[in-house]
Curated annotation (Swiss-Prot):
Superkingdom in the source lineage: Bacteria
Catalytic activity line of the entry: beta-D-ribopyranose = beta-D-ribofuranose
Binding-site residues, substrate: D28, H106, Y128, A129, N130
Protein name: D-ribose pyranase
Gene Ontology cellular component list: cytosol
EC number(s) on file: 5.4.99.62
Organism: Pectobacterium atrosepticum (strain SCRI 1043 / ATCC BAA-672)
Single GO MF descriptor: D-ribose pyranase activity
Stated role: Catalyzes the interconversion of beta-pyran and beta-furan forms of D-ribose.
Subunit structure: Homodecamer.
Location in the cell: Cytoplasm
């Protein structure tokens, strides 16, 4: 049995196969997922697991150099937005690098998310609780 925080074999496999600048999406329960994109569905019920719980566990194993968010999140979901920024700041300190933040419209976010290696669906039921994490390198 794995000893690290991330036990989900599908997510572990996707992270292990990421190359520099490849992306992985963590989304809320309502984010549309194209048929052509790998879906990893973790949603059990409303808010289980939460978006932030999934971000925390995924980033414990993924090297992140950039994050893309929908600009609507700032106004429509400020509590989750601020908590996500706090998590990314802690991740920067842990990784020893800067994580670039990019904001796009929700429509552009949905377009870009379809180009990711996978979309992880959380049980989060708050608006715009989505992030595209772009893989960095550990050297």
């Amino acid at each position: 049995m794995k000893k690290a925080a991330l036990l989900n074999s599908d997510i572990s496999s996707v992270i292990a196969r990421l190359g520099h600048t490849d992306s992985l999406v963590i989304g809320d329960a309502g984010l549309p997922i194209p048929e052509t994109t790998t879906r990893i569905d973790l949603a059990l019920t409303h808010n289980v697991p939460t978006f932030l719980q999934v971000v925390n566990v995924v980033t414990s194993e993924m090297q992140v150099e950039a994050a893309i968010l929908a600009e609507e999140m700032i106004e429509k979901n400020p509590a989750v937005h601020d908590a996500l920024l706090d998590q990314l700041k802690r991740l920067e300190q842990h990784q020893g690098n800067s994580i670039a933040l990019h904001y796009v419209s929700h429509e552009e976010f949905k377009t870009q998310s379809g180009k990711s290696r996978a979309i992880i669906r959380s049980g989060e039921c708050s608006p715009y609780a989505n992030v595209i994490l772009c893989a960095g390198v550990t050297f």
